[in-house]
Amino acid sequence: MKWALALLLGLACSWGRADTPSFSLVFAGDTTLDDAAGALIARGGDPLAAVASLFDNADVRVANLECVVATTGEPVDKNYTFRAHPQVLPVLRRHLDGVTLANNHSGDYGRAAFAEMLGWLQAANLAQAGGGRNLSEAHAPWLVERAGLRVALLSYNEFMPRSFEADHDAPGIAWSEDEQVVADIQRARQQHRADLVVVFMHWGWENETTANGRQRQLARLLINAGADAIIGGHPHVTQDVELYQGKPIIYSVGNFVMKETDNDRQRQAWVLRMTFDRAGASGFSTHPVRLDDDGIPHPDPHRQSPCWRRGQGEPGLCTH
């Protein structure tokens, strides 16, 4: 009789684990498709082919699209401007479900080109966070429902000088105004009934491998407001990771597709995989990639990189 009871209890526990809803997200960093990568696509190639397996079996696959995808517009007055042809989008859609747009290159060719890009993304069935035809759209969450979980994805730019933010009647990106971001997180929880909130930040200083005080202060503010995880980019190098109140902060995953690199550190990056359940983030792994001379990513499996599972304490290092 005791063995039968034990068997029933074991089955009940296994059923409970099977019924626990879970969600997985893969995020890749700064992605420009205007240069060698765009030329490769024009020839029928795929710049993401070598790392395609890193996106396998994820519920949502995301990258930071750090170029405007359009055929119109004129370059603004700045050192670097990036514009890719819409022909890149089918290849992007092959690997991704959506992109983040809140960065300092979405406005490289002006508002009309940005609005054109929004149309191309929609036509390609690529979702986006952090951009819109007006202020409300730019701050609206990208909502994903998987396995009984509703997940809100938000994206913000904090790279100064403050520019190209959406207005009530003008397309643009979501700017990281503290009070507004807190309100957006709370709205995602209350109005959109999100079980989980993930915030993507474009922040920090280029080539700095350690997050600065402002990044740490803001990450804590957003977690206190209700975010379950913070994922960052813009420095073009990887930065440190940490837990705050048991919630992961990945300050920068580095580049993903980027020919314009200044040093070897900018060619070393991570593709992040993070898992969630109803209680929040349950773990993450960072998969090292290395960019070649054309800015195309390739696996770099022998390099250690941060990883973590709930219950283990602070993040450690893993080799994949």
Whereabouts are the PLM-identified features?
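Acidic, metal/ion-coordinating pockets
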Residues: 15, 19-320
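Bacterial N-terminal signal peptides
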Residues: 4-12
